[in-house]
Amino acid sequence: MKIRLNFEKTNLIRLIVAMIFAAVLYFKVTFPVYVLAGFGVSYFLIKSLSVELNNKWLRLALGILMLGGSSVMTAHMVQYLLLDAELRARIMGNKMFLNILCCLVVYLAVQVFTKNVGLTCIISHMALMIFAGINYFVYLFRGNEFIFSDLRSISTGLSVAGNYEFVLDDRAAYVVLLSALYVAFVRKIHVTFEKRLWMAVVCISVVICCCAYIGTETEGTVTETWEQKGSYRNGYLLNFALSVRDSFIAEPDGYSEEVISELEDQYSGDGESYVNQDVEKNPTIIVVMSESYADLSVVGDFLTNEQVTPYYDSLQDNIMKGHALSSVFGAKTPNSEWEFMTGNSMAFLPSGSVVYQQYISDTPTSIVSNLKNIGYTCVAMHPYYETGWSRNAVYPTMGFDETHFIDDFDQTKLLRKYITDQELYESIVERYESKKANEDLFIMSISMQNHGGYTEKYPNFNEQIRTLGASYSDANQYLSLLHESDKALEYLISYFQSVDDPVEIVFFGDHQPSLNTNFYKGLNGKGLSGLTEDELENLYTVPFFIWTNYETETEEVPITSLNYLSTMALERAGIALPSYNQFLADMQETIPAINSRGYYSVSSGCFKHLEDATGEEAEWIDRYQILQYNNMFDKKKQSKVFFPYLQNQ
């Protein structure tokens, strides 16, 4: 082996180009100037390097060393990019080793298709770092990490990406510079495996062994999706691999046709006994799922210069009002839609999955199908692009008769970049006024006005609300948006108070916003880390109400969850409950709230993980999971009693 330094003019030109790039990065991020100088010297020396390998055994050994060493380096660079020093220190040694094996699997898989080890290293390293970079920005934007199910949501993410600011920190800059040096160095070492077939066999064999070992070592390890737990508990690459594993749904314990049959016998009645409201005619039912609408006081107390939602707070007559658990935080709105409409729960699906893009292929039983079966016209409204979360395909599959997206709204009525709640509500009123005589109408609307992020300033939005004491610009913008939503809500309720026909309005938030971590720390003293189960569930709590323009009992609901709201809406509307909703109504008495993180235990007076349930609580949860699996995944043996709509198509 011969190693030489050849100082050529072309290397100076390459150095100048590299330094211009590094200088731009320096002024963007601002890191120590000695890093810039060190990069320049290192880059010039590497480009001047000449390496000759004459011995085939030396080439083989060096090739193996490059693949193994590069896997170690890349795995650590991924962790360095995503986590600060404190969080990086939390990962267990065996988990870091598994992340290195994940990298090695990628390197060896690429090597199967190339003869050149250097090319393999460049392709693999750059692919993994770009992949980590995607997660870096996804976490900045929504407060959760990028996992396997997000691959189906790329188009939706890109559609709102322009509303976010792409910012690099110093760690990201160092990773970019180090990757540039790594690529330059690897290009200087020319190692090829001549016996390509044998090389492919060895690589595939090692990949299989690595995958088997990773699978064995991670049995019982859960996919973490909260904040950065995936990266500092499992390591990001391993956590992503776990999310792939969790995309396959297993039959629940105790699942059988006999259990389904027993439940069918119990809930085959007409559901009239569950009706608690005498309504002369079917009411118009309007649902408003308000984007990022939340009551942040459930997380902790804070003061503002004026009341944020005075009208919402004033509603007291003919209303059921309270708080509900959502299964998502900061993103993945369609999961909240799905829980509300179907009565199903994300509790039994993989962490981070998006039902609209993974599990809806046939028309599911839902409030849409239930109302269509009794003659309602079902309308969906969403003032944004129809392709978001594949709604253009999902809504017709759900059974909606009409769908209205961004082109059906006045696109001059914007707050920031999104169509206002006021415009959405005016469209609801317009559709109501155009309904035919004796037409029963159901409208499912999803607003867009309050969508994150909340850092950019807009000339068309005067922020009226600000927090007192420590002030955070994103929190102020978010609270000001809620204030505008409150004004629009007053318009909607006031209009339907004046109509003669019965009307029911169901209103709830889809999830809490993702705001500055320090703002949350000011609310609960901890921020987003180190929370108890009760404190964590506070971050998944959203307000809701079911209001009618006719006389109904006023009720305060301390806690429920989105999967129960459609059942509660049917009960309050005086509509006989279908069998599945009968089951949910009974279950709610024992399990008042359930979501992707756990459930509220009445017997214990606190939130618990599903696996910690005992006694009657465990029995209800098990039956719920069995019915949901039968509904979603056992199409051949699907219950005709609980899920008749699919059978009648």
Q: How should each PLM-predicted stretch be described?
A:
Residues 52-60, 237, 241, 245-265, ...:
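Extended hydrophobic/aromatic-rich secondary-structure runs
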Residues 8, 137, 141-147, 169, ...:
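A diffuse structural propensity rather than consistent per-protein peaks
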Residues 268-280, 290, 295-649:
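Solvent-exposed soluble domains appended to multi-pass membrane proteins
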Residues 2-231:
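Transmembrane and membrane-interface helices of multi-pass
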Residues 213-287:
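Membrane-interface segments at or immediately adjacent to transmembrane helices
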Residues 151-154, 234-237, 241, 309, ...:
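Alpha-helix initiation and N-capping motif
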Residues 3-52, 174-182, 195-196, 205-209, ...:
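N-terminal leader/auxiliary helical segments
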